[in-house]
């Protein structure tokens, strides 16, 4: 059996969205090593049988000295552990881990989980990011993409490995995110819920605008909530929104399923995604999703059938969509939820994603 090294920028993404792959590798008899900078889910991964390697990493920083240090660490780690194959996730492991693998002649498979805001830059910054990705992925055995737009962009920019494969994100665990019958609240209140980082690029400004306008139109017949970590820039805005009673703020939750179950619709006005896990989980649970018509969101929705799409960065479009949903019948909402579950079962089952990775690992 093989020794497999996983390079990731945090334990949460690995444990919450990719643990089924980790468990499959362990069950198949492989030795699995995990390089992560945090300890949040390190103990769980260790108990499953992984060897944890603490790795210093400034996930979002642009300090060149820190990044060079990370690259050197990866090269040293590869020499010491001599893995048979390496799996890398997110930009820094993809770039610096990938380049280290190429220099050490170790086969590696990279996953582009999304492009974030870096590819919206222009000029020298954009050129630098593209060059870094070219260095990181040049020798890659296979590059996995989570949406077609990311794959197309990389092809246009001539960023490529030896092979590539398109998958539907990390997929969704259909057993964990089980189908729940539509709530049909007797109080006739329509409950909207946003789950995710409370930050500008997730469309939180548009969401706050729509929430306030919905309150003005419908009063107590609409409830708008958020769950997630807040960037410091939004603390005052959230406090004011709560004070004016047009938003409910729920602290970060490890298990969001109970909240999805009680929601009438999940809303994600994001500017860009790799493939939204929140939308997949909501659809799997049988809840309509209202999402930006952007890559990483639109793939999870059949517009008008399992949810509604709207123009990103357009606060009026978001408000109009949420307002339209308030006016829909319970039967229409229930049908949307069932259609969403069927879509997840057909195209987004995480078991299928795991098989796609296993196929490339043993190839």
Q: What are these model-predicted stretches?
A:
Residues 15-20, 190, 194-213, 308, ...:
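A conserved mid-protein helix/loop that constitutes part of the nucleotide-sugar donor-binding site
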Residues 42-48, 213, 217-218, 223-250:
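Short, structured helix-loop element that forms part of the nucleotide-activated donor/catalytic region
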Residues 53, 134, 138-179:
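Donor nucleotide-sugar binding/catalytic pocket of nucleotide-sugar-dependent glycosyltransferases
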Residues 62-66, 155-156, 170-189, 258:
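Acidic anion/phosphate-binding donor-loop and adjacent secondary structure
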Residues 252, 271:
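Aromatic "clamp/platform" in nucleotide-sugar-dependent glycosyltransferases that forms part
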Residues 288-291, 301:
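Short hydrophobic beta-strand element within catalytic cores of glycosyltransferases
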Residues 303-304, 308-315, 324-330:
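Conserved acidic donor-binding segment of nucleotide-sugar-dependent glycosyltransferases
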Residues 317, 324, 331-347, 356-359:
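A short, well-ordered alpha-helix in the C-terminal region of glycosyltransferases
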